[in-house]
């Protein structure tokens, strides 16, 4: 809790992989996930994801609901704020002389919630999404049908 999880290495820019047993979970509370391309975090098992801020996740997943993998998950996802940032990836381009030049490629971010199947059960409430990049914190209460993807079971 109360941590900054950011700037994952660019060839594997991930915020975290959290897997627990359904009988013994983890709480992710009041964290700032910033500049990670994906897995902010990717979760399976029993977890609470409450009062976090997720900024600039690029074209990976802001919150990955266990992907399409098997296994039971029960989650509480409550009062988080997802803010779209400039969104870019580093790309190494090999030059004619054999050196590698790093360039930036602009990307379109994914929807904040991705993955998830009927084995991923969630209580989901009070999450906000600010997608307009205007520099003002003025997001809207998230709507699953328009702001998210995946097919979890809602509790």
Where are these regions (language model features)?
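Right-handed parallel beta-helix
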Residues: 1-39, 46-59, 73-86, 123-130
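Generic marker of residues within folded, mature protein domains
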Residues: 31, 67-70, 117
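Long, contiguous C-terminal flanking segments immediately downstream of a protein's structured core
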Residues: 78, 82-155
């Amino acid at each position: 809790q109360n941590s900054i999880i950011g700037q994952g290495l660019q060839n594997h820019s991930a915020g975290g992989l959290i897997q627990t047993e359904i009988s013994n979970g983890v709480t992710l509370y009041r964290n700032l996930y910033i500049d990670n391309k994906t897995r902010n975090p990717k979760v399976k098992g029993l977890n609470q994801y409450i009062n976090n801020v997720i900024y600039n996740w690029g074209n990976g997943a802001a919150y990955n609901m266990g992907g399409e993998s098997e296994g039971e998950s029960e989650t509480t996802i409550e009062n988080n704020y997802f803010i779209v940032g400039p969104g870019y990836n580093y790309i190494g381009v090999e030059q004619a002389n054999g050196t590698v030049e790093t360039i930036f490629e602009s990307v379109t971010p994914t929807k904040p919630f991705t993955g998830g199947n009927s084995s991923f059960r969630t209580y989901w409430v009070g999450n906000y999404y600010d997608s307009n990049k205007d520099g003002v914190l003025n997001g809207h209460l998230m709507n699953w049908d328009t702001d998210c993807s995946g097919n979890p079971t809602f509790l």
